[in-house]
Protein backbone atom coordinates (compact mmCIF):
# COMPACT_ATOMS: atom_id res chain seq x y z
CA UNK A 1 0.00 0.00 0.00
CA UNK A 2 1.28 3.43 -0.92
CA UNK A 3 0.55 6.49 1.20
CA UNK A 4 0.99 9.97 -0.23
CA UNK A 5 1.52 12.79 2.24
CA UNK A 6 1.31 16.47 1.40
CA UNK A 7 1.20 19.65 3.41
CA UNK A 8 -2.17 21.39 3.57
CA UNK A 9 -2.61 24.54 1.56
CA UNK A 10 -2.22 27.82 3.36
CA UNK A 11 -4.91 30.47 3.04
CA UNK A 12 -3.86 33.30 5.24
CA UNK A 13 -3.84 37.00 4.75
CA UNK A 14 -0.10 36.96 4.37
CA UNK A 15 1.72 35.56 1.38
CA UNK A 16 2.62 32.16 2.83
CA UNK A 17 3.72 29.66 0.18
CA UNK A 18 5.51 26.47 1.25
CA UNK A 19 6.80 23.88 -1.18
CA UNK A 20 8.29 20.40 -0.84
CA UNK A 21 11.80 19.50 -1.87
CA UNK A 22 10.24 16.54 -3.65
CA UNK A 23 9.28 17.10 -7.27
CA UNK A 24 6.48 14.57 -6.98
CA UNK A 25 5.12 16.21 -3.82
CA UNK A 26 5.31 19.58 -5.53
CA UNK A 27 3.45 18.47 -8.63
CA UNK A 28 0.91 16.46 -6.64
CA UNK A 29 0.17 19.57 -4.56
CA UNK A 30 0.21 22.35 -7.14
CA UNK A 31 -0.06 20.63 -10.50
CA UNK A 32 -1.86 17.35 -9.94
CA UNK A 33 -3.32 17.50 -13.40
CA UNK A 34 0.15 16.85 -14.81
CA UNK A 35 0.61 13.55 -12.92
CA UNK A 36 -1.86 10.71 -13.00
CA UNK A 37 -1.13 9.11 -9.65
CA UNK A 38 -3.59 6.34 -10.32
CA UNK A 39 -1.74 5.32 -13.47
CA UNK A 40 1.54 5.24 -11.54
CA UNK A 41 0.06 2.90 -8.98
CA UNK A 42 -1.53 0.72 -11.65
CA UNK A 43 1.85 0.20 -13.28
CA UNK A 44 3.06 -1.07 -9.87
CA UNK A 45 5.94 1.33 -9.73
CA UNK A 46 7.22 0.73 -13.23
CA UNK A 47 9.34 3.33 -14.96
CA UNK A 48 8.29 6.73 -13.74
CA UNK A 49 8.61 9.76 -15.99
CA UNK A 50 7.98 13.14 -14.46
CA UNK A 51 7.31 16.17 -16.61
CA UNK A 52 9.40 18.87 -14.99
CA UNK A 53 8.44 21.68 -17.30
CA UNK A 54 8.74 24.87 -15.24
CA UNK A 55 5.45 26.52 -14.43
CA UNK A 56 6.46 28.82 -11.61
CA UNK A 57 6.01 32.04 -13.49
CA UNK A 58 2.40 31.07 -14.13
CA UNK A 59 1.64 30.26 -10.49
CA UNK A 60 0.25 33.22 -8.59
CA UNK A 61 -0.73 32.66 -5.04
CA UNK A 62 -3.44 34.30 -2.95
CA UNK A 63 -3.23 38.13 -2.95
CA UNK A 64 -0.98 38.03 -6.01
CA UNK A 65 2.10 36.56 -4.31
CA UNK A 66 4.25 34.75 -6.87
CA UNK A 67 5.43 31.21 -6.19
CA UNK A 68 9.16 30.59 -6.24
CA UNK A 69 10.71 27.35 -7.56
CA UNK A 70 12.25 24.72 -5.28
CA UNK A 71 15.73 23.39 -5.76
CA UNK A 72 16.21 20.84 -8.56
CA UNK A 73 15.80 17.27 -7.36
CA UNK A 74 16.68 14.06 -9.14
CA UNK A 75 13.85 11.71 -10.07
CA UNK A 76 15.20 8.57 -8.46
CA UNK A 77 15.01 9.87 -4.90
CA UNK A 78 11.20 10.27 -4.77
CA UNK A 79 10.83 7.08 -6.81
CA UNK A 80 12.68 5.04 -4.19
CA UNK A 81 10.50 6.54 -1.49
CA UNK A 82 7.41 5.81 -3.53
CA UNK A 83 8.43 2.16 -3.92
CA UNK A 84 9.03 1.92 -0.20
CA UNK A 85 5.38 2.79 0.31
CA UNK A 86 5.56 6.38 1.50
CA UNK A 87 6.10 9.72 -0.19
CA UNK A 88 6.85 12.36 2.46
CA UNK A 89 6.58 16.07 1.87
CA UNK A 90 9.00 18.03 4.00
CA UNK A 91 7.50 20.55 6.41
CA UNK A 92 8.24 24.23 5.74
CA UNK A 93 11.06 24.45 8.29
CA UNK A 94 13.04 21.81 6.40
CA UNK A 95 12.84 23.56 3.04
CA UNK A 96 16.04 25.40 2.36
CA UNK A 97 14.93 27.12 -0.82
CA UNK A 98 11.51 28.30 0.35
CA UNK A 99 11.09 31.89 1.45
CA UNK A 100 10.60 32.01 5.19
CA UNK A 101 7.90 34.65 5.40
CA UNK A 102 7.78 34.69 9.20
CA UNK A 103 11.48 35.49 9.45
CA UNK A 104 11.10 38.08 6.71
CA UNK A 105 8.14 39.75 8.39
CA UNK A 106 10.37 42.17 10.24
CA UNK A 107 12.13 42.93 6.95
CA UNK A 108 8.92 43.43 4.98
CA UNK A 109 7.40 46.74 3.96
CA UNK A 110 3.95 47.91 2.94
CA UNK A 111 3.65 50.43 0.13
CA UNK A 112 0.29 52.22 0.06
CA UNK A 113 -0.61 54.06 -3.15
CA UNK A 114 -3.60 56.40 -3.10
CA UNK A 115 -4.72 56.63 -6.72
CA UNK A 116 -6.61 59.89 -7.13
CA UNK A 117 -4.64 61.56 -4.35
CA UNK A 118 -5.71 65.09 -5.27
CA UNK A 119 -9.44 64.35 -4.84
CA UNK A 120 -11.70 65.23 -1.93
CA UNK A 121 -12.04 61.68 -0.62
CA UNK A 122 -8.28 61.25 -0.42
CA UNK A 123 -7.75 64.61 1.28
CA UNK A 124 -10.66 64.42 3.72
CA UNK A 125 -10.76 60.72 4.57
CA UNK A 126 -7.94 58.49 3.32
CA UNK A 127 -4.83 60.47 4.32
CA UNK A 128 -6.30 61.46 7.73
CA UNK A 129 -7.21 57.81 8.36
CA UNK A 130 -3.69 56.67 7.47
CA UNK A 131 -2.23 59.29 9.80
CA UNK A 132 -4.56 58.19 12.62
CA UNK A 133 -3.36 54.61 12.15
CA UNK A 134 0.24 55.79 12.24
CA UNK A 135 -0.43 57.88 15.35
CA UNK A 136 -1.91 54.84 17.11
CA UNK A 137 1.04 52.66 16.09
CA UNK A 138 -1.12 50.42 13.89
CA UNK A 139 0.89 50.67 10.67
CA UNK A 140 3.86 48.35 10.01
CA UNK A 141 7.32 49.52 11.01
CA UNK A 142 8.32 49.93 7.38
CA UNK A 143 5.72 51.64 5.22
CA UNK A 144 5.59 54.19 2.44
CA UNK A 145 2.63 56.19 1.16
CA UNK A 146 2.49 57.41 -2.43
CA UNK A 147 -0.07 59.74 -3.90
CA UNK A 148 -0.79 59.17 -7.58
CA UNK A 149 -2.88 61.47 -9.76
CA UNK A 150 -2.83 63.37 -13.03
CA UNK A 151 -2.18 66.69 -11.31
CA UNK A 152 1.40 67.94 -11.43
CA UNK A 153 2.69 68.13 -7.88
CA UNK A 154 5.94 67.75 -5.96
CA UNK A 155 6.42 65.70 -2.80
CA UNK A 156 6.50 68.94 -0.80
CA UNK A 157 3.24 70.15 -2.35
CA UNK A 158 1.53 66.85 -1.56
CA UNK A 159 2.71 67.05 2.05
CA UNK A 160 1.46 70.60 2.34
CA UNK A 161 -1.94 69.60 0.92
CA UNK A 162 -2.24 66.58 3.21
CA UNK A 163 -1.08 68.43 6.33
CA UNK A 164 -4.10 70.75 6.16
CA UNK A 165 -6.49 67.87 6.85
CA UNK A 166 -4.54 65.99 9.53
CA UNK A 167 -5.65 66.18 13.14
CA UNK A 168 -4.63 64.35 16.30
CA UNK A 169 -7.11 62.51 18.44
CA UNK A 170 -8.97 64.52 21.04
CA UNK A 171 -7.83 62.18 23.81
CA UNK A 172 -4.18 62.03 22.69
CA UNK A 173 -2.53 65.30 21.82
CA UNK A 174 1.00 64.47 22.94
CA UNK A 175 3.71 64.95 20.31
CA UNK A 176 1.10 65.76 17.68
CA UNK A 177 3.35 68.00 15.61
CA UNK A 178 6.24 65.56 15.80
CA UNK A 179 4.04 62.67 14.72
CA UNK A 180 2.72 64.66 11.78
CA UNK A 181 6.23 65.45 10.60
CA UNK A 182 7.24 61.80 10.84
CA UNK A 183 4.15 60.75 8.91
CA UNK A 184 4.56 63.35 6.18
CA UNK A 185 8.16 62.26 5.67
CA UNK A 186 6.76 58.88 4.58
CA UNK A 187 4.47 60.51 1.97
CA UNK A 188 5.55 60.95 -1.65
CA UNK A 189 3.93 61.80 -4.96
CA UNK A 190 4.04 60.58 -8.52
CA UNK A 191 2.14 62.22 -11.35
CA UNK A 192 0.78 60.07 -14.15
CA UNK A 193 -2.17 59.06 -16.28
CA UNK A 194 -4.53 56.39 -14.98
CA UNK A 195 -4.30 54.40 -18.22
CA UNK A 196 -0.53 54.57 -18.73
CA UNK A 197 1.50 51.40 -18.23
CA UNK A 198 4.63 53.51 -18.56
CA UNK A 199 3.60 55.90 -15.77
CA UNK A 200 2.78 53.01 -13.45
CA UNK A 201 6.12 51.40 -14.32
CA UNK A 202 7.78 54.65 -13.21
CA UNK A 203 5.76 54.45 -9.99
CA UNK A 204 6.94 50.86 -9.55
CA UNK A 205 10.55 52.03 -9.85
CA UNK A 206 10.01 54.67 -7.15
CA UNK A 207 8.29 52.17 -4.88
CA UNK A 208 11.22 49.78 -5.20
CA UNK A 209 13.64 52.57 -4.28
CA UNK A 210 11.76 53.17 -1.02
CA UNK A 211 11.26 49.47 -0.34
CA UNK A 212 15.05 49.19 -0.38
CA UNK A 213 15.18 45.48 -1.09
CA UNK A 214 12.75 44.55 1.67
CA UNK A 215 10.05 41.96 1.13
CA UNK A 216 7.35 44.15 -0.40
CA UNK A 217 3.57 44.17 -0.07
CA UNK A 218 1.47 46.72 -1.94
CA UNK A 219 -1.95 48.23 -1.36
CA UNK A 220 -3.64 50.42 -3.98
CA UNK A 221 -6.61 52.57 -2.93
CA UNK A 222 -8.63 53.62 -6.01
CA UNK A 223 -10.15 56.96 -5.07
CA UNK A 224 -11.21 57.66 -8.66
CA UNK A 225 -14.46 57.51 -10.69
CA UNK A 226 -15.58 54.01 -11.70
CA UNK A 227 -15.37 54.76 -15.42
CA UNK A 228 -11.57 54.96 -15.21
CA UNK A 229 -10.55 52.57 -12.46
CA UNK A 230 -10.43 49.48 -14.70
CA UNK A 231 -7.60 51.14 -16.61
CA UNK A 232 -5.88 51.94 -13.33
CA UNK A 233 -6.28 48.33 -12.14
CA UNK A 234 -4.84 47.03 -15.40
CA UNK A 235 -1.81 49.30 -15.20
CA UNK A 236 -1.21 48.68 -11.49
CA UNK A 237 -1.49 44.93 -11.95
CA UNK A 238 0.77 44.71 -15.00
CA UNK A 239 3.33 47.38 -14.11
CA UNK A 240 3.35 47.98 -10.35
CA UNK A 241 2.26 44.86 -8.48
CA UNK A 242 4.50 43.23 -5.89
CA UNK A 243 6.91 40.66 -7.28
CA UNK A 244 6.74 38.27 -4.30
CA UNK A 245 4.43 39.69 -1.63
CA UNK A 246 0.73 40.44 -1.77
CA UNK A 247 -0.96 43.05 -3.93
CA UNK A 248 -4.41 44.30 -2.87
CA UNK A 249 -6.73 46.86 -4.42
CA UNK A 250 -9.42 48.81 -2.54
CA UNK A 251 -12.31 49.77 -4.81
CA UNK A 252 -14.79 52.50 -3.86
CA UNK A 253 -18.49 52.41 -4.67
CA UNK A 254 -20.49 52.70 -6.85
CA UNK A 255 -19.99 49.17 -8.11
CA UNK A 256 -22.02 49.71 -11.27
CA UNK A 257 -25.55 51.07 -11.82
CA UNK A 258 -27.41 47.77 -12.12
CA UNK A 259 -26.86 44.02 -12.28
CA UNK A 260 -25.49 44.08 -15.81
CA UNK A 261 -22.97 46.90 -15.34
CA UNK A 262 -21.88 45.53 -11.96
CA UNK A 263 -21.25 42.07 -13.43
CA UNK A 264 -19.29 43.62 -16.30
CA UNK A 265 -17.21 45.58 -13.81
CA UNK A 266 -16.46 42.44 -11.81
CA UNK A 267 -15.45 40.55 -14.95
CA UNK A 268 -13.10 43.36 -15.92
CA UNK A 269 -11.51 43.44 -12.47
CA UNK A 270 -11.00 39.69 -12.48
CA UNK A 271 -9.03 39.89 -15.72
CA UNK A 272 -6.22 41.39 -13.66
CA UNK A 273 -6.96 40.43 -10.03
CA UNK A 274 -8.09 37.43 -8.03
CA UNK A 275 -11.19 37.84 -5.89
CA UNK A 276 -8.95 37.72 -2.80
CA UNK A 277 -7.10 40.79 -4.05
CA UNK A 278 -10.25 42.91 -4.51
CA UNK A 279 -11.45 44.84 -1.44
CA UNK A 280 -14.80 46.47 -2.28
CA UNK A 281 -15.22 49.07 0.42
CA UNK A 282 -18.48 50.24 1.95
CA UNK A 283 -17.41 52.60 4.70
CA UNK A 284 -20.65 52.13 6.63
CA UNK A 285 -19.56 48.60 7.45
CA UNK A 286 -16.64 50.18 9.30
CA UNK A 287 -18.89 52.24 11.57
CA UNK A 288 -18.51 51.29 15.22
CA UNK A 289 -22.20 50.56 15.84
CA UNK A 290 -22.53 48.53 12.65
CA UNK A 291 -19.57 46.37 13.63
CA UNK A 292 -21.07 46.06 17.11
CA UNK A 293 -24.32 44.73 15.66
CA UNK A 294 -23.20 41.09 15.62
CA UNK A 295 -21.70 41.45 19.12
CA UNK A 296 -24.95 42.84 20.46
CA UNK A 297 -26.93 40.02 18.94
CA UNK A 298 -24.73 36.94 19.30
CA UNK A 299 -23.11 37.59 22.68
CA UNK A 300 -26.19 38.68 24.64
CA UNK A 301 -28.71 36.00 25.55
CA UNK A 302 -31.49 38.53 26.04
CA UNK A 303 -31.51 39.50 22.34
CA UNK A 304 -30.93 36.36 20.27
CA UNK A 305 -34.17 34.58 21.35
CA UNK A 306 -36.13 37.72 20.40
CA UNK A 307 -34.46 38.10 16.98
CA UNK A 308 -37.23 36.67 14.78
CA UNK A 309 -40.77 37.18 13.49
CA UNK A 310 -42.18 35.77 16.74
CA UNK A 311 -41.11 38.89 18.66
CA UNK A 312 -40.18 41.56 16.10
CA UNK A 313 -42.97 43.45 14.32
CA UNK A 314 -40.81 45.47 11.92
CA UNK A 315 -37.27 46.76 11.44
CA UNK A 316 -36.39 50.23 10.14
CA UNK A 317 -33.13 51.40 8.57
CA UNK A 318 -33.09 55.18 8.43
CA UNK A 319 -30.52 57.47 6.82
CA UNK A 320 -30.94 61.23 6.60
CA UNK A 321 -28.71 64.16 5.71
CA UNK A 322 -29.49 67.79 6.47
CA UNK A 323 -27.73 69.05 3.33
CA UNK A 324 -28.27 68.65 -0.41
CA UNK A 325 -25.98 67.50 -3.19
CA UNK A 326 -24.02 70.78 -3.08
CA UNK A 327 -21.21 70.33 -5.56
CA UNK A 328 -21.91 66.67 -6.33
CA UNK A 329 -25.04 67.21 -8.39
CA UNK A 330 -23.52 66.02 -11.65
CA UNK A 331 -22.30 62.77 -10.09
CA UNK A 332 -25.39 62.22 -7.97
CA UNK A 333 -27.82 62.72 -10.86
CA UNK A 334 -26.33 59.69 -12.59
CA UNK A 335 -27.07 57.44 -9.61
CA UNK A 336 -29.73 58.80 -7.27
CA UNK A 337 -30.41 58.03 -3.62
CA UNK A 338 -31.40 54.37 -4.12
CA UNK A 339 -28.09 53.46 -5.73
CA UNK A 340 -26.06 55.83 -3.58
CA UNK A 341 -27.39 54.78 -0.16
CA UNK A 342 -30.00 52.03 -0.17
CA UNK A 343 -28.48 49.39 -2.43
CA UNK A 344 -25.18 49.42 -0.54
CA UNK A 345 -25.08 51.06 2.92
CA UNK A 346 -28.55 50.16 4.17
CA UNK A 347 -28.78 46.78 2.47
CA UNK A 348 -25.42 45.70 3.89
CA UNK A 349 -26.57 46.66 7.39
CA UNK A 350 -29.81 44.76 6.82
CA UNK A 351 -27.88 41.63 5.81
CA UNK A 352 -25.76 41.80 8.97
CA UNK A 353 -28.87 42.34 11.07
CA UNK A 354 -30.91 39.49 9.60
CA UNK A 355 -28.29 36.80 8.90
CA UNK A 356 -28.23 33.47 10.69
CA UNK A 357 -25.48 32.71 13.20
CA UNK A 358 -22.28 32.12 11.20
CA UNK A 359 -20.12 29.06 11.79
CA UNK A 360 -17.32 31.34 13.01
CA UNK A 361 -16.13 34.93 12.83
CA UNK A 362 -14.09 34.05 9.76
CA UNK A 363 -14.71 36.48 6.90
CA UNK A 364 -16.00 33.81 4.54
CA UNK A 365 -18.41 32.36 7.10
CA UNK A 366 -19.93 35.78 7.79
CA UNK A 367 -20.17 36.71 4.13
CA UNK A 368 -21.73 33.33 3.32
CA UNK A 369 -24.56 34.07 5.76
CA UNK A 370 -25.06 37.56 4.35
CA UNK A 371 -25.39 36.12 0.85
CA UNK A 372 -28.02 33.64 2.08
CA UNK A 373 -30.11 36.49 3.48
CA UNK A 374 -29.84 38.55 0.30
CA UNK A 375 -30.83 35.59 -1.84
CA UNK A 376 -33.86 34.99 0.39
CA UNK A 377 -35.22 38.48 -0.18
CA UNK A 378 -37.99 39.35 -2.62
CA UNK A 379 -37.00 41.69 -5.45
CA UNK A 380 -38.28 45.16 -4.63
CA UNK A 381 -41.67 46.04 -6.17
CA UNK A 382 -42.63 49.46 -7.49
CA UNK A 383 -45.70 49.55 -5.21
CA UNK A 384 -43.36 49.25 -2.23
CA UNK A 385 -41.25 52.27 -3.18
CA UNK A 386 -41.79 55.99 -2.65
CA UNK A 387 -39.41 58.51 -4.24
CA UNK A 388 -39.02 62.22 -3.62
CA UNK A 389 -36.92 65.22 -4.63
CA UNK A 390 -36.21 68.30 -2.52
CA UNK A 391 -37.26 71.71 -3.75
CA UNK A 392 -36.32 75.28 -2.91
CA UNK A 393 -37.40 76.48 0.51
CA UNK A 394 -37.10 79.78 2.35
CA UNK A 395 -36.77 79.81 6.12
CA UNK A 396 -36.52 83.24 7.68
CA UNK A 397 -33.99 85.20 5.69
CA UNK A 398 -32.29 82.11 4.28
CA UNK A 399 -33.27 80.51 0.98
CA UNK A 400 -32.19 76.93 0.40
CA UNK A 401 -31.84 75.85 -3.25
CA UNK A 402 -33.78 72.98 -4.76
CA UNK A 403 -32.10 69.98 -6.34
CA UNK A 404 -32.59 71.20 -9.91
CA UNK A 405 -31.24 74.64 -8.96
CA UNK A 406 -27.81 73.02 -9.04
CA UNK A 407 -26.16 74.10 -12.30
CA UNK A 408 -24.76 70.60 -12.85
CA UNK A 409 -28.24 69.02 -12.68
CA UNK A 410 -30.66 69.04 -15.65
CA UNK A 411 -33.72 71.19 -15.00
CA UNK A 412 -36.05 68.31 -15.88
CA UNK A 413 -34.23 65.73 -13.75
CA UNK A 414 -36.41 63.05 -12.13
CA UNK A 415 -33.55 61.65 -10.05
CA UNK A 416 -34.77 60.89 -6.51
CA UNK A 417 -33.03 62.54 -3.57
CA UNK A 418 -35.34 60.67 -1.18
CA UNK A 419 -36.65 57.12 -1.18
CA UNK A 420 -38.56 54.85 1.16
CA UNK A 421 -39.04 51.14 0.57
CA UNK A 422 -40.48 48.01 2.15
CA UNK A 423 -38.52 44.77 1.73
CA UNK A 424 -39.26 41.21 2.82
CA UNK A 425 -37.15 38.15 3.60
CA UNK A 426 -38.81 34.87 2.68
CA UNK A 427 -37.29 32.52 5.22
CA UNK A 428 -38.43 30.85 8.43
CA UNK A 429 -36.97 33.50 10.73
CA UNK A 430 -38.31 36.62 9.04
CA UNK A 431 -41.40 35.57 7.08
CA UNK A 432 -43.91 38.44 7.03
CA UNK A 433 -41.74 41.00 8.84
CA UNK A 434 -41.46 44.28 6.89
CA UNK A 435 -37.96 45.71 6.67
CA UNK A 436 -38.42 49.41 5.98
CA UNK A 437 -35.71 51.61 4.50
CA UNK A 438 -35.70 55.38 4.29
CA UNK A 439 -32.93 57.59 2.93
CA UNK A 440 -32.89 61.21 1.92
CA UNK A 441 -30.98 64.42 1.44
CA UNK A 442 -31.88 67.95 2.56
CA UNK A 443 -33.99 66.68 5.45
CA UNK A 444 -34.54 68.17 8.91
CA UNK A 445 -31.68 66.31 10.59
CA UNK A 446 -28.55 64.24 10.01
CA UNK A 447 -28.72 60.71 11.36
CA UNK A 448 -28.32 57.01 10.63
CA UNK A 449 -30.05 54.47 12.82
CA UNK A 450 -31.59 51.02 13.09
CA UNK A 451 -34.96 50.76 14.83
CA UNK A 452 -36.33 47.40 15.94
CA UNK A 453 -40.00 47.58 16.90
CA UNK A 454 -41.22 44.60 18.90
CA UNK A 455 -44.70 43.12 18.87
CA UNK A 456 -47.37 44.19 21.32
CA UNK A 457 -47.61 42.21 24.54
CA UNK A 458 -50.43 39.65 24.13
CA UNK A 459 -53.21 40.30 26.65
CA UNK A 460 -51.36 43.27 28.11
CA UNK A 461 -52.90 44.05 31.52
CA UNK A 462 -52.02 47.71 31.10
CA UNK A 463 -53.53 48.33 27.67
CA UNK A 464 -56.12 50.65 29.20
CA UNK A 465 -53.31 52.91 30.37
CA UNK A 466 -52.33 53.55 26.75
CA UNK A 467 -55.83 54.16 25.45
CA UNK A 468 -56.53 53.22 21.85
CA UNK A 469 -52.98 53.90 20.64
CA UNK A 470 -51.17 50.65 21.42
CA UNK A 471 -48.11 51.83 19.46
CA UNK A 472 -47.30 53.94 22.50
CA UNK A 473 -46.67 50.69 24.36
CA UNK A 474 -44.28 49.31 21.73
CA UNK A 475 -40.87 48.27 22.96
CA UNK A 476 -38.22 49.57 20.60
CA UNK A 477 -34.49 48.90 20.34
CA UNK A 478 -32.64 51.79 18.70
CA UNK A 479 -29.07 51.58 17.44
CA UNK A 480 -27.90 55.06 16.51
CA UNK A 481 -24.98 54.75 14.10
CA UNK A 482 -24.42 58.51 13.80
CA UNK A 483 -24.14 61.10 15.20
CA UNK A 484 -23.60 60.59 18.94
CA UNK A 485 -23.39 56.80 18.80
CA UNK A 486 -25.80 55.13 21.19
CA UNK A 487 -27.88 52.04 21.90
CA UNK A 488 -31.11 52.47 23.80
CA UNK A 489 -34.14 50.36 24.58
CA UNK A 490 -37.57 51.90 25.00
CA UNK A 491 -39.54 50.25 27.78
CA UNK A 492 -42.79 50.95 29.60
CA UNK A 493 -42.37 52.15 33.15
CA UNK A 494 -44.54 53.33 36.01
CA UNK A 495 -44.29 57.00 36.78
CA UNK A 496 -43.40 57.45 40.48
CA UNK A 497 -46.28 58.55 42.64
CA UNK A 498 -49.79 57.56 43.61
CA UNK A 499 -51.99 55.89 41.05
CA UNK A 500 -50.92 53.92 37.98
CA UNK A 501 -49.58 56.17 35.26
CA UNK A 502 -47.18 54.73 32.68
CA UNK A 503 -44.70 56.31 30.35
CA UNK A 504 -41.96 55.16 27.99
CA UNK A 505 -38.41 55.39 29.29
CA UNK A 506 -35.05 54.71 27.68
CA UNK A 507 -32.41 52.33 28.94
CA UNK A 508 -29.60 54.30 27.34
CA UNK A 509 -26.01 53.43 26.44
CA UNK A 510 -24.53 56.67 25.14
CA UNK A 511 -21.04 55.91 23.90
CA UNK A 512 -19.58 59.33 24.65
CA UNK A 513 -20.68 59.01 28.29
CA UNK A 514 -19.65 55.37 28.71
CA UNK A 515 -16.33 55.38 26.85
CA UNK A 516 -13.74 58.13 27.12
CA UNK A 517 -11.81 56.98 24.05
CA UNK A 518 -12.69 58.65 20.79
CA UNK A 519 -14.33 56.31 18.27
CA UNK A 520 -12.10 55.69 15.24
CA UNK A 521 -13.31 56.77 11.83
CA UNK A 522 -14.69 53.98 9.64
CA UNK A 523 -11.90 54.46 7.10
CA UNK A 524 -9.29 53.77 9.75
CA UNK A 525 -10.79 50.39 10.56
CA UNK A 526 -11.23 49.40 6.91
CA UNK A 527 -7.75 50.49 5.86
CA UNK A 528 -6.22 48.54 8.73
CA UNK A 529 -8.28 45.48 7.80
CA UNK A 530 -7.13 45.72 4.18
CA UNK A 531 -3.48 45.92 5.26
CA UNK A 532 -3.95 42.90 7.54
CA UNK A 533 -5.93 40.96 4.93
CA UNK A 534 -9.12 40.86 7.01
CA UNK A 535 -12.03 40.70 4.53
CA UNK A 536 -14.97 40.46 6.94
CA UNK A 537 -16.13 44.05 6.34
CA UNK A 538 -15.57 44.06 2.59
CA UNK A 539 -18.06 42.99 -0.06
CA UNK A 540 -17.64 39.79 -2.04
CA UNK A 541 -18.70 39.57 -5.69
CA UNK A 542 -21.62 37.21 -5.04
CA UNK A 543 -22.91 39.59 -2.34
CA UNK A 544 -22.83 42.35 -4.91
CA UNK A 545 -24.71 40.25 -7.46
CA UNK A 546 -27.40 39.36 -4.93
CA UNK A 547 -27.79 42.99 -3.83
CA UNK A 548 -28.20 44.31 -7.36
CA UNK A 549 -30.72 41.60 -8.24
CA UNK A 550 -33.06 43.07 -5.59
CA UNK A 551 -32.97 46.65 -6.85
CA UNK A 552 -32.29 46.46 -10.60
CA UNK A 553 -35.89 45.63 -11.69
CA UNK A 554 -37.47 48.52 -9.78
CA UNK A 555 -34.73 50.96 -10.83
CA UNK A 556 -35.35 50.06 -14.46
CA UNK A 557 -39.10 50.47 -14.01
CA UNK A 558 -38.70 53.88 -12.37
CA UNK A 559 -36.56 55.10 -15.26
CA UNK A 560 -38.56 53.48 -18.08
CA UNK A 561 -41.89 54.82 -16.77
CA UNK A 562 -40.33 58.20 -15.88
CA UNK A 563 -41.97 58.17 -12.46
CA UNK A 564 -42.17 61.74 -11.14
CA UNK A 565 -40.85 62.09 -7.58
CA UNK A 566 -42.92 63.67 -4.83
CA UNK A 567 -41.47 67.07 -3.99
CA UNK A 568 -40.62 68.08 -0.43
CA UNK A 569 -39.19 71.33 0.98
CA UNK A 570 -35.50 71.56 1.82
CA UNK A 571 -35.14 70.95 5.57
CA UNK A 572 -38.46 69.12 5.99
CA UNK A 573 -39.18 65.56 7.15
CA UNK A 574 -39.56 64.29 3.60
CA UNK A 575 -42.53 63.47 1.36
CA UNK A 576 -45.83 62.45 2.91
CA UNK A 577 -45.88 59.32 0.76
CA UNK A 578 -43.37 57.67 3.09
CA UNK A 579 -45.97 57.74 5.88
CA UNK A 580 -48.57 56.07 3.67
CA UNK A 581 -46.09 53.35 2.73
CA UNK A 582 -45.40 52.57 6.39
CA UNK A 583 -49.10 52.74 7.27
CA UNK A 584 -49.86 50.09 4.62
CA UNK A 585 -47.92 47.66 6.82
CA UNK A 586 -49.32 49.11 10.07
CA UNK A 587 -46.01 50.72 10.96
CA UNK A 588 -44.99 54.17 12.16
CA UNK A 589 -41.57 55.58 11.39
CA UNK A 590 -39.80 55.55 14.74
CA UNK A 591 -37.80 58.70 14.07
CA UNK A 592 -40.96 60.76 13.51
CA UNK A 593 -42.99 59.69 16.55
Curated annotation (Swiss-Prot):
InterPro entries: G6P_DH, G6P_DH_AS, G6P_DH_C, G6P_DH_NAD-bd, NAD(P)-bd_dom_sf. Pathway: Carbohydrate degradation; pentose phosphate pathway; D-ribulose 5-phosphate from D-glucose 6-phosphate (oxidative stage): step 1/3. Regulated by metabolites. Post-translationally inactivated by cysteine-mediated redox modification via the ferredoxin-thioredoxin system in the light and this avoids futile cycles with photosynthetic CO2 fixation. GO terms for biological process: glucose metabolic process; pentose-phosphate shunt, oxidative branch. D-glucose 6-phosphate binds at residues 253, 283-287, 321, 340, 441, 446, 482. NADP(+) 1 binds at residues 116-123, 150, 253. The active site is at 345 (proton acceptor). Disulfide bonds join 168-176. It catalyses: D-glucose 6-phosphate + NADP(+) = 6-phospho-D-glucono-1,5-lactone + NADPH + H(+). GO terms for molecular function: glucose-6-phosphate dehydrogenase activity; NADP binding. Its main location: plastid. GO terms for cellular component: chloroplast. Keywords: Carbohydrate metabolism, Chloroplast, Disulfide bond, Glucose metabolism, NADP, Oxidoreductase, Plastid, Transit peptide. Its EC number is 1.1.1.49. NADP(+) 2 binds at residues 438, 451, 480, 488-490, 573. It is found in: Plastid, Chloroplast. It comes from the Eukaryota. Belongs to the glucose-6-phosphate dehydrogenase family. Catalyzes the rate-limiting step of the oxidative pentose-phosphate pathway, which represents a route for the dissimilation of carbohydrates besides glycolysis. The main function of this enzyme is to provide reducing power (NADPH) and pentose phosphates for fatty acid and nucleic acid synthesis which are involved in membrane synthesis and cell division. Homodimer. This is Glucose-6-phosphate 1-dehydrogenase, chloroplastic. It comes from Nicotiana tabacum.
